[in-house]
């Protein structure tokens, strides 16, 4: 099978690796893969070393004539079976480029919300009539997309991004950096804060936690609107604002558990995956794909979205029972390895592509 990918690989290594390694594995299995991306992306050297053809081609805007011309020439002359676009810039350009070629256009969707039939821009991406199939990062995203597509709802499918535990094995950040010891119980929340992240719910939940050994680390940017709420928390002195960090996986490995109080918009949260890979359990909400990663009462806790008291209750269950933290953490790591592994992702992609080619 001959496949052309249009995506960006200029993000953090851990964020692009599940996607990038999938295409490398396809080449190892005998498929021909070409990737159109920024030529200076860090992953380009690895792609080429592994036999992936790379074209230095990335659109500057949603309709970029130069990109369309380059991709059309590649699709036409290369006789590709599948072309696969990953974002709001690459999908429209790939759609125009695929006109007059035999390539089936597949798109990727990674978040819930934001796709509407009344929005003209949606017809440049997932609602474009050229789209033959949509691959979603979670069942929550799939169900959301199916509400909005006009036809072929059965060709909107879930394929989880695959992971390998070895990708995430990192040394733990030292607790002493935050003035903490092994006697303390630590929860970490990593986010680039916006309203959908539910930080107010988390801070409200701290009003219902009463354990002097419990500390909360808030990792990332954008917490400023919540400073007054944090000051009003009874455990304000044990809430640590540590800013943007390059070692988030190491912090997750150090924490006893991680918390994600999101109220909307989540696809399949990477912070939960990084925590699972390092054997760290989670407290999450029912929004988006989080419940697909966390088995409630087995690998962590899933609580109703926006319910601060329920969130606090789940945290308290872990704070007061370290054996449960250990039990859930082991189970979380095993679940990631079993249900979200890279080999399954490649298998499901190829099966879906083959299905589209038969139609």
Specify the residue positions occupied by each region the protein language model found:
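Donor nucleotide-sugar binding/catalytic pocket of nucleotide-sugar-dependent glycosyltransferases
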Residues: 55, 130-147, 151-169
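Conserved acidic donor-binding segment of nucleotide-sugar-dependent glycosyltransferases
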Residues: 295-297, 301-308, 317-323
